[in-house]
Swiss-Prot record:
SUPFAM superfamilies: Aldolase (SSF51569). Homotetramer; dimer of dimers. One of its GO terms (molecular function) is 4-hydroxy-tetrahydrodipicolinate synthase activity. It catalyses: L-aspartate 4-semialdehyde + pyruvate = (2S,4S)-4-hydroxy-2,3,4,5-tetrahydrodipicolinate + H2O + H(+). The active site is at residues 143, 171. Its EC number is 4.3.3.7. This is 4-hydroxy-tetrahydrodipicolinate synthase. Catalyzes the condensation of (S)-aspartate-beta-semialdehyde [(S)-ASA] and pyruvate to 4-hydroxy-tetrahydrodipicolinate (HTPA). It comes from Psychrobacter arcticus (strain DSM 17307 / VKM B-2377 / 273-4). Pyruvate binds at residues 55, 213.
Amino acid sequence: MSTAYDDIKTRLQGSMVALITPMLRDGTVDYKRLADLIDWQIEQGTHCLVAVGTTGESATLSMQEHSDVIRYFVQHVKGRVPVIAGTGANNTMEAIKLTQDAADAGADCALLVAPYYNKPPQEGLYQHYKAIAEAVNIPQMLYNVPGRTVVDIAQETVERLADLGNIVAIKDATGSVARGEQLIKVVGDRLVVLSGDDGSALELMKVGGKGNISVTANVVPKAMSETFTAALRGDFDAANQVHDVVKHLHRDLFIESSPIPAKYALHKMGMIDKGIRLPLVWLAEQHHATIDTALVRANLL
């Protein structure tokens, strides 16, 4: 593959936020708040932005909205940091269309979640990703999150996919450091291995991971950036010192299905309106105190 593919591999590192998609109370995308969040994340040191991933409510945006939000990200970021576009689907043809739209918009990389609900076998997973890789000329990242998709991309399948030149990375959201470490051993020479689990991401960095695609960074981007910048240079004492102040958020921001708690937190911080799409609903009142206390502990309120 071209040097552009090698270049993006060197830039897929550090603290990478899976940004929420801000919405008005009627559920429409709030582009003004989205611009503000993008600028804030970059100012706070976030290394990469993920548009319309799981945390961005990809499952409930229409295909047109999905592509529109990705295009807006790219246009507003203007090359300041890489934009990773969530373009996965459980319909291969839809995933190809979304990925092509992201490539046309100028996204730096496509994030492709494993097909959910229809539970393909490993050969189906391989053929799904192979079809997208062959159809669209853009760096692509595998996304394994079996807790949501109910399908697990096996290591052997990842090894096969690593031979396809435009698959450049994997986001491993299994939460298993041992598994991530094994991936680094077998495909680390070909793929960038990233954590997709805030709670174990720093531990994965200690064994060769390159960064973290984070929910928590929605709320504390500077702390997460400082943590993973220190980790990248091998200074884990400094990383832990910053991380210890905010690591409770990794638990509390999942007190309900993500991104419900993160959206509540950002609303409480005055950064977004009270908008979310069904079937997700606003944070239950009995959990407000948990998030409020977590924000106070992180010096955010």
